[in-house]
Amino acid sequence: MQRAALLSVLVLVPQLVGGLPGVPPVDCSDIYQQDNSRPSGVYTVYPVGDTYGVQVFCLPERTDGSLNFYRPWDYYRTGFGSADGEIWLGLENLFQLCLRRKYELLVDMEDFEGNKAYARYSSFSVGPEVEGYKLEVTGFTDGGAGDSLGSHNGMKFSTFDKDQDVSSQNCAELYLGAFWYERCHNTNPNGVYRWGSYGSISAIGVEWDTSGKDMTIL
């Protein structure tokens, strides 16, 4: 299998465009609709209502491994990190965003040699906590990265202290991450940030595994 070190950018793209002047932005698209000259950076969005603001970095990504993503359920539920660096928005915030609008998901990758690939999904949503923040993702378009997320469709979110995968093992504990694991994963974006390929232990890293390729996302 081929292995490559990749940088990943995860982008939620609204299918239905909103954002009227004077209305608090629900997500990053509202901010850029108001002024498309704004650079990537820290902004406040209001996924629940105009009294509850959440700082986000548009576009969020794993950048340098400075933030520990091996965390318990409560952190993943509410969110953690810094809006001007690495960040996890929070499962509840993702759920509230998906209640308000329909979204696409773009997984965009580029290695340190400038090679680019992406995977796009025309429908992305996260269910409520009572359903384990279940992932719904369909409508795959291949931009060279392959479909590493399809097998995770319909799965509940798991952390090492809240195992909700369908494996007999605790996938989050085994692969040092947190995700919508199945048995266990074809992608592990919240895994260990590593500099380069590490052969047999690649599965614990920030990985996008496709047919014929094993891409380690940095």
Specify the residue positions occupied by each region the protein language model found.
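Mature extracellular or lumenal effector domains of secreted proteins
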Residues: 1-218
